[in-house]
Amino acid sequence: MSGLSRIGVAIDSDLLDKFDSLIGQRGYTNRSEAFRDLIRDELVEKTWESPESQVVGTVTLVYDHHVRLLNEKLTGIQHDFHHSILSTLHVHLDHDNCLEVLVVRGRSADVRKVADVLISTKGVKHGRLTITTTGAEMK
């Protein structure tokens, strides 16, 4: 256990029961790793706040490909932001709807900008940006 510090935490028993249930459902074998992951999540979220932070993530879009010129608009936007987009995946969900997942990387501000432009495009039914860390600062 070199490099690890032991700490004590006082927590309401009802809350602890709920936490134990949650971590059991997620497959944690002990509370320590679950607490470490909670802390890591908060630290990663904090990095998003700085517009200069390097982040990686995904932009997920659902749209009707029959909407006039929507495919062309989305492709044009992607080319405008080619420096932030590493890869795309296109899935035909059914006869009308498509799912597009873009892997993005760069400054937090740039990643948010490309996501905002894509998600707000008329005809996009749903969109979501999910950001995580590049892992460089994580141990």
Curated annotation (Swiss-Prot):
Sites where the protein binds Ni(2+): H79, H90, H92, C98
SUPFAM superfamilies (UniProt xref): ACT-like (SSF55021), Ribbon-helix-helix (SSF47598)
Pfam families: NikR_C, RHH_1
Co-factor binding details: Binds 1 nickel ion per subunit.
Cofactors (names): Ni(2+)
GO MF term list: DNA binding; DNA-binding transcription factor activity; nickel cation binding
Gene Ontology biological process: response to nickel cation
Sorted UniProt keywords: DNA-binding, Metal-binding, Nickel, Transcription, Transcription regulation
Family under the similarity heading: Belongs to the transcriptional regulatory CopG/NikR family.
Function per UniProt: Transcriptional regulator.
Protein name: Putative nickel-responsive regulator
